[in-house]
Amino acid sequence: NYDVVQLISPYFLHLRSERTLPAYHYLRRFNGKVFLGAFGTDYYYIRACMETDTYRYSDFKTGNCYRDTDFNKMTLQDWYYGGAAHATRTIAESCNGIMACLWEYYVAYQLLFPEKTAFVPLPINLHKIVSRIRTVPEILNFFIGIQNFKDTVKGTDVMLPVLQEVQRKHPDLCRITEVHDVPLSL
């Protein structure tokens, strides 16, 4: 009996997405409005990546070339062809509105749901950001955090060799700090 319920994604319960549909229908029946958050990779984002020229490059394609990675195959299986795709389509078609936090998610939904998709950017309080660099450093420090299971999706498989090449050419001018699979809870 709430006026507004916001779902963070079709995977709003820790169940397979298609198993959340009975809970979604319950929420629709007993609450005023239900809004879907477009906050990550889902059916409509993948659809925009695979079926349109909306993005010049994405997790799934660069130009017309599909990025054939194990992670992409797994993601496509559920979020583009499987139960998560069905749940996303069902919720997006019947919810009262869709809120996207990033431009790429906004345009993915805007293509099909222009009347109920809104861009609500992530808030960043610029007054709380203080620059720590007071002078030009003698050594440039690069930090690269790598999630091994997502390195090809996030591009760290490409960025790390480039950073290493820069360091080989200029060992006295740069340093690399490389970490792997650091939990988000730290």
Regions found by a protein language model. Name each.
Residues 13-16, 42-47, 53, 106-110, ...:
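Short catalytic/ligand-binding loop motif for oxyanion handling, primarily in non-cytosolic enzymes
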Residues 120-124, 128-154, 160-163:
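Conserved donor-binding/catalytic core segment of Leloir-type glycosyltransferases
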Residues 157-185:
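A conserved nucleotide-sugar
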Residues 28-34, 95-96:
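A short helix->loop->beta-strand "cap" motif at the edges of active sites that frequently abuts
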Residues 2-20, 32-37:
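Short N-terminal targeting/anchoring amphipathic segment
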Residues 46, 75-117, 161:
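A short, active-site helix/loop in glycosyltransferases that binds the activated sugar's phosphate group
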